[in-house]
Amino acid sequence: MSKLLVFGHQNPDTDAIASSYAFDYLAKKAFDLDTEVVALGDPNEETAFALDYFGVSAPRVVTSAKAEGASHVILTDHNEFPQSISDIREVEVYGIVDHHRVANFETANPLYMRVEPVGSASSIVYRLFKENRVDVPKDIAGMLLSGLISDTLLLKSPTTHASDHRVAAELAELAGVKLEEYGMAMLKAGTNLASKSEAELIDIDAKTFELNGNAVRVAQVNTVDIAEVLERKEAIEAAIREVMASEGYSDFVLMITDIVNSNSEILALGANMDKVEAAFSFKLEDNHAFLAGAVSRKKQVVPQLTESFGA
């Protein structure tokens, strides 16, 4: 077998980078695999903060597994092929570590697959370290903690599993940081949107979902001031229309999430706005609506859209 590439999803967030970085280390130590961690995009500002804080180099970015001479890959923090590497259907998926729904995915051969309904893929990777009795180095503990903090908004998201609180406490101790202090600093580092173009803003954390034959793009940005983001609404909508036309998305849903007050504004465009409105029981006005208490794409947006589009 050629070298195994380990990577998270496209437009990688902190959990995608952290879980793949840590699993690459574990694969070598516990399973004697010849792996290399790579990424399907550059780290965002939140992830860059974590990488810099713990002295970790960002994984190199690749666009094709076969171009790297790899015939087998390991996926972390995703399993759906539309969210993965461009030639995912041309290589063999050796393993998966994920905490999302399983969909748009199939393999010709059996594989190692660890999927749990917890707050982050990083939580699962940490558990794998413990199960295989592999010590967690400080930098890896820090990155795994960062992935968990990011995906659960410092354990405030409804996706947070009861076990995640213990995991976060243990990782914070191993990483030598104060959980709340480090967590808020990292999350705030990811809310600097002023320097982003509208095209960059809608692509910071975006995933494509195949919903009943529709390619639906669901993006999320975190902020401490929703009104400031909505001041750019017209330009954001223009960027959304442009990417919908170029990429063939039927619909685009942008979550603008207030990480302080735990609410989101939904900005949506596309061919199926009736289904979007039905999903959340709201009425879009000028393409947007307020969604109280919504902070999680995985639990509070995608399942609702999936049900509505499937109806």
From Swiss-Prot:
Localisation per UniProt entry: Cytoplasm
GO MF term list: inorganic diphosphate phosphatase activity; manganese ion binding
Primary location class: cytoplasm
Keyword vocabulary terms for this entry: Cytoplasm, Hydrolase, Manganese, Metal-binding
Pfam families: DHH, DHHA2
Source species, domain of life: Bacteria
Database matches in Gene3D superfamilies: DHHA2 domain (3.10.310.20), inorganic pyrophosphatase (n-terminal core) (3.90.1640.10)
GO cellular component: cytoplasm
Cofactor binding annotation: Binds 2 manganese ions per subunit.
Residues the record lists as binding Mn(2+) 1: 9, 13, 77
Known EC number: 3.6.1.1
Catalytic activity reported: diphosphate + H2O = 2 phosphate + H(+)
Family: Belongs to the PPase class C family.
HAMAP family assigned: PPase_C
Protein name, entry field: Probable manganese-dependent inorganic pyrophosphatase
Native species: Streptococcus equi subsp. equi (strain 4047)
